[in-house]
């Protein structure tokens, strides 16, 4: 009988050890001539590994990005998804720990005129589940996959948010530059109209020439108003990203913007492995395989 019990325990442990869930490893074999020649790995950091503060050095833009990371509703929702997945993962890890049960008891007994006797007991029992077929292990792997996927989603939302704020900011700088040029052009045409009218009064130009100059002047005025409207629309878009009321945002000048003078884009395969959507797809496949083995 004792021998049979030992044999049964040994079989159970062997089944639990081998498991039916194999670790997924993505294929990384790349043909040598895929990129038309030998790829040399450089020590310089790729663009995808740079911190956004190193790429965007404008203090006004950095301030806007920091505000967006604190107030944007999509990013906050992604943060909550990460916290939820982390709690699920912790629950899956705790399933491997033994469960303790505490059942305190007390009795009072008395015989005839003798003093009552009080008896107390504090039994503690421990139990745990043998993961014979890998169910608990697969659940833990699923929780890990969901946590990694939620983290990749958060990173993707964060990247899109930073890129959106930066793109909107530089659009404002570009429109500011165009507006400044248009206003200078407006002043130049205003002087041209005045000069042409003076020439007409002196008999050196006709009414047709004045009308042509005025038409060009009014056209430039219209472009100034159009640029001002575009700036208001872009500021509204920026306010939407920052989850705040639209306002006139303080900003720098396009001509003074500085970017890294030299950076590497990185090896294509490494760039793909750094993309949150690619990592999320790989994790989704891992989650699916874990679900199918249950």
Description of each model-found segment:
Residues 102-108:
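Transmembrane beta-barrel strands of outer-membrane/channel proteins
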Residues 287-294:
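Single conserved hydrophobic/aromatic residue that forms the stacking wall/gate
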Residues 67-76, 83-98, 111-112, 125-142, ...:
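A glycine-/polar-enriched beta->alpha junction
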Residues 2-8, 15-70, 228-273, 279:
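Terminal intrinsically disordered/low-complexity segments used for targeting and assembly
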Residues 116-120:
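Residues that define the transmembrane beta-barrel architecture of outer-membrane proteins
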């Amino acid at each position: 009988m004792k021998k049979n019990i030992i044999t049964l325990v040994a079989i159970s442990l062997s089944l639990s050890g081998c498991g039916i869930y194999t670790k997924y490893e993505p294929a990384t074999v790349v043909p040598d001539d895929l990129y038309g020649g030998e790829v040399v790995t450089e020590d310089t950091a790729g663009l995808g590994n740079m911190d956004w503060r190193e790429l965007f050095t404008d203090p006004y833009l950095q301030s806007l990005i920091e505000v967006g990371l604190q107030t944007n509703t999509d990013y906050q929702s992604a943060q909550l998804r990460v916290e939820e997945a982390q709690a699920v993962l912790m629950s899956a890890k705790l399933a491997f720990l033994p469960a303790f049960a505490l059942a305190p008891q007390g009795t009072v007994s008395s015989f005839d005129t003798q003093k009552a006797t009080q008896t107390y007991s504090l039994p503690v029992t421990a139990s745990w589940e043998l993961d014979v077929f890998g169910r608990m292990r697969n659940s833990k792997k699923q929780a890990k996959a969901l946590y990694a996927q939620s983290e990749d989603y958060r990173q993707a939302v964060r990247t899109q948010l930073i890129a959106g704020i930066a793109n909107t900011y530089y659009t404002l700088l570009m429109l500011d530059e165009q507006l400044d040029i248009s206003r200078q052009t407006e002043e130049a045409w205003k002087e041209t109209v005045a000069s042409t009218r003076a020439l007409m009064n002196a008999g050196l130009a006709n009414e047709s020439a004045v009308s042509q100059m005025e038409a060009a002047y009014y056209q430039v005025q219209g472009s100034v108003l159009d640029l001002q409207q575009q700036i208001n629309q872009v500021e509204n878009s920026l306010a939407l990203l920052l989850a705040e009321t639209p306002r006139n945002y303080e900003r720098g000048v396009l001509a003074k913007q500085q970017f890294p003078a030299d950076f590497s884009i990185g090896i294509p395969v490494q760039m793909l492995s750094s993309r949150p959507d690619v990592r999320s797809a790989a994790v989704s496949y891992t989650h699916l395989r874990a679900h199918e083995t249950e």
